[in-house]
Design a protein with these regions (language model features):
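Catalytic phosphate/metal-binding cores of nucleic-acid and nucleotide-processing enzymes, i.e., regions
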Residues: 1-108
Length: 108
């Protein structure tokens, strides 16, 4: 299975290859804890992705931030390497304005 960093790079590359703006969020002393790892604009839609290694677990604060983004109308997910195809489907759906806001938060 992919490491968290290699999976993160795969996601960023896919976003870039599809013309999406994306930024890797680096938390530090002055930033807000729990913010997802990747923040992106996909065809005008806000997408936030908390990237996890296959055995990783999101913190409660990370889940709260994902929920806050979804409540604000954005798309936010916790993505695992085994959920790569689901994540690609979500990104592809945003690219063509066809998406399901009811998709599970955890993509495994």
């Amino acid at each position: 299975m992919a490491s968290e960093k290699s999976f993160e790079n795969k996601i960023k590359r896919y976003l870039k290859d599809n013309g999406c703006y994306r930024v890797k969020y680096h938390g530090n002393y002055f930033s807000e804890n729990g913010t997802p790892d990747i923040l992106a604009c996909v065809n005008g839609y806000f997408l936030a992705i908390e990237v996890k290694a296959q055995t990783g677990t999101p913190s409660e604060l990370q889940l709260v931030k994902v929920d806050d983004i979804r409540k604000a109308g954005g798309f936010a997910y916790v993505a695992y390497p085994s959920g790569w195809e689901k994540l690609k489907d979500i990104i592809d759906g945003l690219l063509i304005d066809r998406f399901n806001r009811e998709e599970d938060v955890i993509l495994k």
